[in-house]
């Protein structure tokens, strides 16, 4: 089941995060950047339950292909011509319980400072990771980090690129990589991997030469309010001894306002029904107990960072109806949103309780 969701995630990310961004620059071929990096790091012991695994120093390699935006779409100039890229990443964890991992991710690489010879960038990406070695109750029960072979990955990185020649650049970087299946399969403490990087970039064009285009006017919807109605579904495993995957669904009503070219602010109400909580409650309650309602309702505020049809989503919510106290009183959400049309959108979101993944939400909605 996780594999099916994983390939759906890969399709959406590769189709919207890479090709969708690139499609807007199709009239003029934008220059490419090819990179090869060596990486080294350590596993962060973010909970006592994984300290026995945070003893090695993983090493890895990355190959990536980036397209330098050049002004063919209005948002290129708004973000000072970022790069969009596809990366293939390999890690050897030097620990037999963890083995190796292979990942593919799409990302945006935003420059904060750029001269003819130097760049200082922030990179943010997401994708899929594959772990041949995972938790097995009989043979690998100490691997509490990785419960499934297929996992989502999130990557954040600071990079410094300095020119060695007209086309060749030396790259130094600091990164944080996260691997998790979003509680679809337990155990799922996930891997947090701080890294240092050293590598080379081949720039097809340096320095950047944006297209000579006229300044674009403000989008017509800046300052306008909108209403979003959406529903989401997800599946999660309760624990490693219960192999059933339980349905989690939600409905959301949100209001928002586009405050500038780059940002939407949103606030909403939503209701949740997590069927794994019913099973959990029945396991712990006495037969004579009156069971509380496992449904929850919450209110949230959030931000959407806009890249054409694509947006990075972040929410912070509070439960105001929570009879069964199975988690903290607040929740967070990180995700990717894509507008298929002006009205119809889809999301892939990770809902989190206090840093621990709760569920991956697959959302479909309507903007009014």
Regions found by a protein language model. Name each.
Residues 62-66, 107-109, 157-159, 199-201, ...:
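Outer-membrane beta-barrel architecture
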Residues 55-56, 92-101, 116, 239-246, ...:
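Solvent-exposed loop/turn segments connecting transmembrane beta-strands
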Residues 1-35, 120, 168, 194, ...:
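Bacterial Sec-dependent N-terminal signal peptides
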Residues 48-51, 91-94, 140-146, 182-188, ...:
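Extracellular loop and loop/strand-boundary signature of outer-membrane beta-barrel proteins
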Residues 34-38, 84-86, 122-126, 156-158, ...:
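Membrane-embedded beta-strand positions of outer-membrane beta-barrel proteins
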Residues 63-65, 192-213, 357-368:
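Outer-membrane beta-barrel "beta-signal"
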Residues 72-75, 116-120, 162, 166-170, ...:
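Repeated loop/turn-to-beta-strand initiation elements of outer-membrane beta-barrel proteins
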Residues 38-44, 67-69, 88-94, 126-134, ...:
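Transmembrane beta-strands of outer-membrane beta-barrel pores
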């Amino acid at each position: 089941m996780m594999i099916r969701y994983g390939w759906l995630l890969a399709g959406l990310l590769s189709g919207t995060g890479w090709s969708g961004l690139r499609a807007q620059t199709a009239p003029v071929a934008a220059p490419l950047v090819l990179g090869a990096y060596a990486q080294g790091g350590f596993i962060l012991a973010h909970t006592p339950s994984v300290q026995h695994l945070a003893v090695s120093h993983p090493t890895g390699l990355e190959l990536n292909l980036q397209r330098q935006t050049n002004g063919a779409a209005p948002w290129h100039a708004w973000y000072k011509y970022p790069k969009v890229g596809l990366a293939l990443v390999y890690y050897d964890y030097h620990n037999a319980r963890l083995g190796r991992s292979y990942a593919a991710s799409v990302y945006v690489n935003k420059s904060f400072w750029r001269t003819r010879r130097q760049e200082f960038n922030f990179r943010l990406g997401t994708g899929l990771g594959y772990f041949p070695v995972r938790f097995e109750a009989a043979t690998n029960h100490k691997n509490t980090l990785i419960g499934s072979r297929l996992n989502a990955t999130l990557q954040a990185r600071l990079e410094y690129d300095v020119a060695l020649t007209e086309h060749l650049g030396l790259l130094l970087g600091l990164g944080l990589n996260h691997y998790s299946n979003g509680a679809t399969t337990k155990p799922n403490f996930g891997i947090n991997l701080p890294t240092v990087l050293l590598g080379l970039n081949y720039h097809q064009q340096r320095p950047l030469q944006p297209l000579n285009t006229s300044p674009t006017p403000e989008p017509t919807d800046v300052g306008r309010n909108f209403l979003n109605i959406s529903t989401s579904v997800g599946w999660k495993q309760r624990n490693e001894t219960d192999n059933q995957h339980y349905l989690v669904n939600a409905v959301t009503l949100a209001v928002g306002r586009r405050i500038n070219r780059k940002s939407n602010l949103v606030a909403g109400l939503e209701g949740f029904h997590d069927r794994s909580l019913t099973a959990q409650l029945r396991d712990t309650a006495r037969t004579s107990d009156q069971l509380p309602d496992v449904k929850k309702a919450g209110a949230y505020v959030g931000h959407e960072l806009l890249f054409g049809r694509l947006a990075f989503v972040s929410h912070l919510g509070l439960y105001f109806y929570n009879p069964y106290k199975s988690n903290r009183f607040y929740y967070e959400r990180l995700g990717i949103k894509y507008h298929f049309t002006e009205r119809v959108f889809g999301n892939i979101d990770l809902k989190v309780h206090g840093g621990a993944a709760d569920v991956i939400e697959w959302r479909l909605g309507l903007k009014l």
